[in-house]
Every structure is written in C-alpha cells, then in structure tokens.
C-alpha cells in the first residue's frame, strides 16, 4: 500500500473510532447499537492497517533516522495506537476485566489512550501534512480494491472475534451481577472522590428560570414525594453492567412539587462534587432520583443520599451525590 494511502487509511480509522466511541457514550442505548458495530469494525481495520504502516515507518526510519520532533511525535502516536488497540482487543477476548487494582479499568485506559491519541494525531498531521497529491489520486481502481479488501477483512475478523468473545452487551460491558442491593462495583467519575456527606445538613436545592422561588429540601422531606420503583440497567463506561431495583421519586414529580415543571425544557443535575449533566425534557421525564437500591439505602460509594437513575443512558450520566437540580 502506498505511503500516503496507508496514512489516510489510518487517519480515517482513528477518526471513525473517536467519533463512534464518543457518540455511543452520549446517545441512548437504542440509538447507539450501530455505532458499537462501526467501532469494532474500525478497530479491527486499524490493527490490520498497522501492518502496512509498519512497513512504511520502517523504511522512513532507515532513511531519516530518529532525529527531528516529527519523528518523535509519530512514534508517540504509534505507541498510543498500540496501547489503545491492544487494550480494546484484550478486552474483547477476555484477557482483561473490569476488576482492577486501581481507579480505572482496562476499558477506561483504552478510552484515555484513544483520547490522547487524537491530540497526538492532530499534531502529527500538522507537522507532517502534505498537500499533494490530491485525494482524487487515491480514487483509482487499485486503491479502491485495496480499501474494499481491508473493509471486508475487517468485517470477517470482527465476526470471528465476536464468536470467541466473552458474553457482553453491545457496549462491550460485562455482567457484574444483578439484584444484589449495594453489592456491585463502585465507579467514580473522573478524579472525584467519595464525599463525606452529613445527611442532617445535606439539602437538595431546586431552582430554575421560572417564576417559582428556589426550594431547598432536607432528606426527610424527600419522603413526602410520591414513591417510585423501577428495575433499570446501569451500563458503566468502566466495562460492566448490572440491573438493580431502584427506588426513590421521579425527577418530574420533584419539579412539579417545586412549581417548575411546566416551562422546563432542560434539566441540569449537579453533584456535590461538581459533576453535572444537562438532560432534555424527554430524558428528564424518564429519570428517577433514587435513595435506595434493592431495598437498601444507597451506600456512600453508590451515591448516598441521592443519585440519578437515567434509563438507557450510560453510567457516567447517572449523577451521584445529587445536591442541586436546575430547570430551564
């Protein structure tokens, strides 16, 4: 494969992986299914493309040596590509698990390496970018056949990997047990730590852009809201999933109680740690603010005294330790 065609193939694969990975995180599960397939196929295509890239890079290093910042940026990109792709494949075939001795699982590290790779690739393209030949040069019959062969091989290899992979959801997450109360993995978003919350002084603040004045509710006040229960799957981006019986009150009931439901089109839920997310009206109407799981009060690691349960959305959007809700 010509050098520039190999580079463009790698760039296309990495771009596809980043776009499909990020969008699949943000979209509801019902809309993300095709993106998971695209992500797996692009990942296999990336690994296959590395064979051609290795030949190109070896010739280039023999000719130019390792001097120059562009070469080192390229080597950094190669290293991150190997780490991200290696962790992804290891996860698929079950060589690594979501159980980990430190804060992030192998799947988390796969994501971190992929995001770091994006920045390195941009720098590499800017430093080594070439304007000639134009892309139309690669539209010939030979290039098209090579591209189709790579795509076909990627689909075949992906199907083969899926046959030997451990049981998992479309997202790649593995089962971590269900209906176990608080006995399921504890995952902390980003660099958050589990806060020490004194429930006696904790307050849930509800405010918005309506005429209603802000409201603060104590933990004991939550018992006056209509009680809701639901069995919902929590699919964590750390690579595991669990189905639990959550109980609490609906976000819609809370807003109605505080006089802020009619005009709200977006609802922002904020943790005492600062982690926050804004949900549209349809998502907010499905959400539950849970105080219990499996009949047990939430443990500190699982969000006590209050956490969001957001059906069909990934776990990093299930805000823990909720301290404020803003309707807009």
Each model region followed by its residue ranges:
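Structured, non-membrane catalytic/scaffold regions adjacent to prosthetic-group chemistry
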Residues: 160-328
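Membrane-embedded alpha-helical bundles that constitute the cytochrome b-like, heme-associated redox core
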Residues: 1-184, 193, 206
